[in-house]
């Protein structure tokens, strides 16, 4: 399809959907949307090749919503996503687009949620279900997810599901769906396994291929920072270390604009929030203050910042990483205006590394990592700024009266002038001390790990890993009842554990494959609920029945000895690159809060 419709209204979508799109600021469909929406409205199967950030979520959700039977309280649309983050994102998009379609219910299903909450939500009859393959397959086997009324199936980021080892689960799910349904498959690349699925399960699909033309200007210096510790503290440190005329900080939610603005105000920064709740008069007043220099920092959402064009902005901070590449490019494009150089910084959480890779892949360039500014730099910056203020006072002409006061202080207290000046300097520093204590937070050694992880992304099969004999003190050894005889590979185990347990793959330790079982190192402190979740988890359609090995050191020595005796080179298939080194490991409580947090539906 070559013709690109000028607006969404011309595509023939439900007026209530158009109302939501207008409110969200959608005007002109992207190429993938203009190509896919008419085909899906007609009931055709679609095979779409497009990068993340091309607008593919709207490309499949809008036409499927249009064809939905609101009165039927049963799953009619099923979306498979590789990660819980993407599942939540897609579910939120469906909810936003159907805001004015009264009676539409959307349910995300993924590992880590309590089953009773999911079962209760399923009994309410959601028309749209978005989930990860493992959890969806589990519900199908339990008989708690009824797909007899399904007419629309979407595979989002199919190549990512293949990479994470979920493709067998995907095929199992697709084999249980009624034959009379419509399928949309989206993938950034088209490996043979994805082609095989399209040939087996799709009916004469129309192939849509969209070439990414997202580019950034070379005069914008980009970098990212891997988040550790408190983001607000890091934000303040970056602002203090950076020379900027004005900066805009992008966040995802309206509440975040207020929270970040309040945090900056408490630390002496002249900032303001910009969100959709502001009336037009206040919005214009805020932007005018930014333009004329009475305001230096603006915290905004993507929607609120639409159309914002201020030449003073020299620094853009992505406090919350955008979910698509196009939004990232639009954000950072607001700096470096009027022939000036710009600077863009991206905060990346551990669980958001996939989004960073998507941005880099789409832009066809690598974004360098930066470190948190050191205390020495902050001390130097504060001293320089303080010296400027002192110099300004020295150049003023009204110091005579203060000189007289100084004489009184000096003669009364019998102090030498240097000690008195030091005392006054300490008093004058205010809330920003000129002498800063060394960093309390010790950064984990992420640099090589993260860079190596990205380099290994495309050549997993050729990687070799060093053997580690001992179990780290911050890890526990578990046994799972799947092994080489089941066709299991390390990538299958990593994908299942990371997705179902919401554990970053870097915190999965040594994995050893044996004939009928495998062993895996996981962080200490796993809750009973999470262990039960893993017990129900399936890999290649087989329950793993995870069990803690009490005498882990003895067991590890035993299996290592047996591996050497049998000369089984494949028994040591995966050893994490220092994930649990004592010097790099977070505290046990940090493991619990970061990796084992339970989420409700």
Swiss-Prot record:
Protein's cellular compartments: Cytoplasm
Domain Helicase ATP-binding: 37-208
Catalytic activity field: ATP + H2O = ADP + phosphate + H(+)
EC number(s) on file: 3.6.4.13
One annotated GO biological process: cellular response to cold
Binding site for ATP: 50-57
Domain Helicase C-terminal: 231-378
GO CC annotation terms, alphabetical: cytosol; ribosome
Region (Disordered): 552-601
InterPro entries listed in its UniProt record: CsdA_RRM, DbpA/CsdA_RNA-bd_dom, DEAD/DEAH_box_helicase_dom, DEAD_box_RNA_helicases, DEAD_helicase_DeaD, Helicase_ATP-bd, Helicase_C-like, Nucleotide-bd_a/b_plait_sf
Keywords for this protein: ATP-binding, Cytoplasm, Helicase, Hydrolase, Nucleotide-binding, RNA-binding, Stress response
Major enzyme class: hydrolase
Top-level taxon of origin: Bacteria
GO molecular function: ATP binding; ATP hydrolysis activity; RNA helicase activity; RNA strand annealing activity
Cysteine disulfide links: none
Pfam families, alphabetized: DbpA, DEAD, DeaD_dimer, Helicase_C
SMART domains cross-referenced by the UniProt entry: DEXDc, HELICc
Function as written in the Swiss-Prot or TrEMBL entry: DEAD-box RNA helicase involved in various cellular processes at low temperature, including ribosome biogenesis, mRNA degradation and translation initiation.
Family: Belongs to the DEAD box helicase family. DeaD/CsdA subfamily.
HAMAP family documented for this protein: DEAD_helicase_DeaD (MF_00964)
NCBIfam families named among the record's database cross-references: PRK11634.1
Protein name: ATP-dependent RNA helicase DeaD
Annotated gene: deaD
